[in-house]
Amino acid sequence: MKEIKDFEKIRIKIASPDQIRSWSYGEVKKSETINYRTLRPEKDGLFCERIFGTTKEWECYCGKFKSIRYKGIICDRCNVEVTHFKVRRERMGHIELSAPVAHIWYYKYIPSRIGLLLDITASNLNSILYYEKYIVIEPGDTDLKKMQLLNEDEYSEAKERYGMSFSASMGAEAIKTLLENLDLDELSSKLRLQMIDKDDKTDKKLLRRLEIIENFKISGNKPEWMIMDVLPVIPPEIRPMVQLDGGRFATSDLNDLYRRVINRNNRLRKLLLLNAPEIIVRNEKRMLQESVDSLFDNSHKRKVVKGTSNRPLKSLSDALKGKQGRFRQNLLGKRVDYSGRSVIVVGPELKLHQCGIPAKMALELFKPFVIRKLIESEAVFNIKRAKSLIEQEVDEVWQILDNVIKEHPVLLNRAPTLHRLGIQAFEPVLVEGKAIKLHPLVCHAYNADFDGDQMAVHVPLTPAAQAESWALMLSTNNLLNPANGHPIVFPSQDIVLGLYYLTMERKNVMGEGRKFSNFNHVLLAINNKSLDYNARIYVKVGEEYIKTTAGRVVFSEALPGKISFVNKTLSDYELQTLISEVYVIYGSSIVIEMLDIIKELGFKYATKFGCTISMSDIIVPQEKKVYVEKANREIAKIQNDYTKGVITGEERYNNVVSVWSKTNEELTNKMMEILKKDRDGFNVIYMMADSGARGSRNQIRQLAGMRGLMAKTSGDIIELPIISNFKEGLSVIEFFISTNGARKGLADTALKTADAGYLTRRLVDIAQDVVVRIEDCGTINGIKVEALKNGEEIIEPLREKAVGSYSIERIKSPITGEIILDVNEEITEDKIKELETVGIDKLVIRSVLTCEAEHGVCQKCYGRDFSNNKPVSIGEAVGIIAAQSIGQPGTQLTMRTFHIGGVAQAGSEDDKIALKNAFILNGLEGFNVQVDGGLLFTRKGVLRVINVIYEESIKKIKKLKVSDSQKVIKGMSLFIDKSGVEVLSSHIGYIKIKDNKLMIVSEEQEISLKVGTRLEINVGDYVEAGRVIGTFDPFAEPIIAEVKGKIKFKDIILGTTLKEEINLETGNIEKRITDQVFESLDPRILIINDRGVEIASYVLPGDAYLQVEDGQDIDIGDIIAKLSKGSEKTQDITGGLPRVNDLFETRIPKNLTEMAKVSGVVQFKAIQKGKRLINVIDEYGVEHKHYIPAGKHLLVRDGDVVRAGDMLCDGRINPHDVLEILGGISLQEFLLAEIQDVYRKQGVSINDKHIGVIIKQMMKKVKIVSVGDTNFVYNQKVDKHAFYEQNKRVIEQGGEPAVASPILIGITKASLNIDSFISAASFQETTKVLTDASIAGSIDDLRGLKENVVIGHLIPTGTGMNLYKRVKVRENSNSEV
């Protein structure tokens, strides 16, 4: 069989009986395998040489022909062809079945494919196939119906009654006849008519049936091929039988399964020849069906066939499925030769592009190269001799090895390979010993440390592979993190500590205050020991003297020439910033040089500093006692309020946790202050934390402050804090509480790592075929981006979101009118600076989400490749990079819990509103009432404020150059002051002149207010920075009276909707609305006036605490009822990772909110079946119904005006609702924001475009709403591009196009619905995917990476793209590349 390498596509179909026979080289008639005496295969058996080929090379079975010269001759005695024994891997046989048999994939898997075609239920189909019931094939002129099932008695009765005028049968024969008689075209049109009749209420079964029928029609498969008359036998080398040491044999399970089939088949044949009784024949047929089922899929059956030692046998399906199956074990994850692994140790003397390989390992890895050189140098003349020289390890061998490995890169890999930086290329350097030496700065990319980690080495062999290793994979070409473009090669730990020590400043040390005219003099003074590294000195730089320290001079002097003087204390953050800046300004070559210098300086001065920790370095603040006493007093007050019944149990708990969190924070601040002052900032513990070398504020707090609150395993916080720290030692109870958190940490780590790994796998699978394929897709759509702010605080600047993208619109300067950015121009760092200067902070950019490339994405929509800060090149596998960028931090984050040791991470809740900067209150929104001279918000509200960025008294101004409300930008003239100096603006904003002040103010911002907020200011007020303007209760949401009157209870019945509980701790009676839902009861509180007329009504949600009595008088602003917030949980990505999972899988959240479907006015209706009906009446007066579970806390009241997409009740948002109500763009923004929120909280930076790539893949399909004149089926899910294509064709022919709505599919489902059946089959549900693909006759275009890896092609990205396939690497000379 010739090798097939050059093919573009692969197709899978159902094999017809003729096709199976044409593959076969002969029929297997006996179940014997090999002869026990001769150990040669038996004739006509499962290993027969006549069928499958000879077992001995170029020799027939009987030995008549023994030589290659008889190649191709068939022996006349034994009928065995003289050929190579490798044909036993390719040649197939077959078994002629004595009775037809159904294929388990097509009848057993849900939904049963045969069942759908014939419209028979799975259980009925089973009973026919297993010879329990008859099915009527032709009713003739009887009362029977076609396809009617008859049991034994009914059949006998019908036989007696009608004789031969009808035909009924059982088993696979009956099903085969029915399938042969199917008219697919007629059936298809019949079902389409049924679908149109049913319209919206079409059931899934109809759609499934139609899809299967269409698939059969398109593929050319015949339905009756799902029933087999002939069974293929796979080649014997694939189901081998090998002799073990003790003379026993080990055999593949498949041989046992085949043996059972053959035995039963032969027995059935004999019985049929003997005309045996029907009942015996039927039983044998059933057994044959069973044995064929277990051959194809043993694990899917109820009664599994077991072999020796009671182990289920592995069938053909099992060989494909799962992690140990053919796809994942052998095709996607192969073991590689020319590789080795060993423990890693640090190699501080290496350059960034080098790694140390143990000499012995290198000799083994490069053996073939060494042998070649030995023969070339004529030291030996054959390979055998060369091998023995290598074993003796003579000197010549080492010399040759040295030459061979020069400039021959090797790849180093550390498992788990979470992102592409887990494999990098290095130039090998031979080292003594048996450990691989690794450069300390690449550890971060590998996430490696030297506590026993192992790494694998791989040798790229071909010149092309070596060239790619040098050009693309060398560690010096991988300085940036592809997830966000920040440097990933940066110093940490010892290096940081050394440089921090070197660049710190210290008072009163040798040489303080001296002046030096140049750097060399400083270095001389240090060498002569007349100057301390940390001394403050003055050095001439350029024309002037600058104040610096000797150490900083040493550092700057060592850096490459171009880099300007660095005059600050270097912490890890400062070093990363420095590396980033140097990369942007000077490029990678200077950075690489600088990194090696930084590494050497860091290690050198860390050694000189020689820091050690002693108990006296851990300083416990004297004030600790005061803080703890204050906290205890506050807690006593909270307890007192609780005892009086003023607050509920949940509020008490939340308040206690909040007090301890605040206390801990205050104590930590005090402790850090003390440590900073200790020894002029040279306290070692403080230095380690401040420099970022080791440890964190959190860990020091546990050493010298207090351990604080701990979390239970459930995530709840234990309200009893650990007041001691590790220096003082823990009491027994404190130690016991501690163990809880520590154990949680370890258990979480183990479980969550697997979760994160699985997330990565699903992400890779959905995005693996997203490759940059074209330059420009020509779209005119884009997405809006702006800086992400929380109030005035910028969380993520515009730069992070827009740099490296392309603009979709032309942007002109608002002042000069010049074009700053043109359409389709790249947004660079400089362009962003220009835009910021003129005050533009919103852009519309091209994005992967709006890219219209048919396959993958285009260069312009993707923008910049973060791994090298250049525009992305065609052929870049951006999908996989996106998946790795999202998955890799997931794994890192799961391990985060465990380092803090389970200390609870709950912030203390604020109960005040105060802004960091001065502002003017511009307006209010939301229902509020006047109470005690302030405003009380009875519902959620919004403050509209303008921040004051700059202010100056009018009295100091001589001449004003600007007017009220004018926009100003940086550098614009504002005024001339009394001394005649022109003052320029250093801000962007608008001029406001008020209260004799000239101010620059920002654009209006919104601040949301909770229910029950009390506001102390009025519209138009100027408020100075930090002033408290309002207060609220952070732990409870009140329901507040908005009118004055008398309370009247409605549907509040004790024991039904109201329960009274006596609190055992306080003895108070708590009145609480139950959360049970009653059909007709709707608990409410009415307020009535003097005449008894209802003037207000308040719906009470479940779990609300009543604060009033029936008939009581009430005033405006009084609290009617309270809803407690749930107890504080500690926030950790343990909560975050499942959240990311849910978003990517588009799961419907448990506690769902209902969103308004349209904008309009809310109208409350009665409760029906435990759900409250709320109508939203739109502008045309149309009512849109919303059903909300009774007992949910409503966020709207009768008569409120809502916008489409507003939440009507408490709960989580369902992404599918967002798509339906607000459309695709809003959904993309929602998913992006939610996913980013989880990562941002953990301090992980991932660029939006990576998440965008995944979301794009989730929104690839649309659902057909109206069929028009297309071939689509109503409710079918189809690919967007296929939909547009077919519509285009139909419109051109003058037909009516189909209409579809966008849908969102979770990543697992989307991976299984992918175009490539090979990729889908190797992901999950292998047999199901292959079953459907074979019916549809699917063609795999081999576009993605995975399918090409499976079939052994180069992946179609980078240098493997079709563009480059015709390019050949040629050597100039005969020497090795």
Swiss-Prot record:
Its cofactor is Mg(2+); Zn(2+). The keyword Membrane does not apply. CDD domains: RNAP_beta'_C, RNAP_beta'_N. Gene3D superfamilies: 1.10.132.30, 1.10.150.390, 1.10.1790.20, 1.10.40.90, 2.40.40.20, 2.40.50.100, RNA polymerase II, clamp domain, RNA polymerase Rpb1, domain 3. InterPro entries: DNA-dir_RpoC_beta_prime, DNA-dir_RpoC_beta_prime_bact, RNA_pol_asu, RNA_pol_N, RNA_pol_Rpb1_1, RNA_pol_Rpb1_3, RNA_pol_Rpb1_3_sf, RNA_pol_Rpb1_4. GO terms for molecular function: DNA binding; DNA-directed RNA polymerase activity; magnesium ion binding; zinc ion binding. It catalyses: RNA(n) + a ribonucleoside 5'-triphosphate = RNA(n+1) + diphosphate. Zn(2+) 2 binds at residues 777, 851, 858, 861. Zn(2+) 1 binds at residues 60, 62, 75, 78. Mg(2+) binds at residues 449, 451, 453. PANTHER family: DNA-DIRECTED RNA POLYMERASE (PTHR19376), DNA-DIRECTED RNA POLYMERASE SUBUNIT BETA (PTHR19376:SF54). Belongs to the RNA polymerase beta' chain family. HAMAP family: RNApol_bact_RpoC (MF_01322). NCBIfam families: rpoC_TIGR (TIGR02386). This is DNA-directed RNA polymerase subunit beta'.
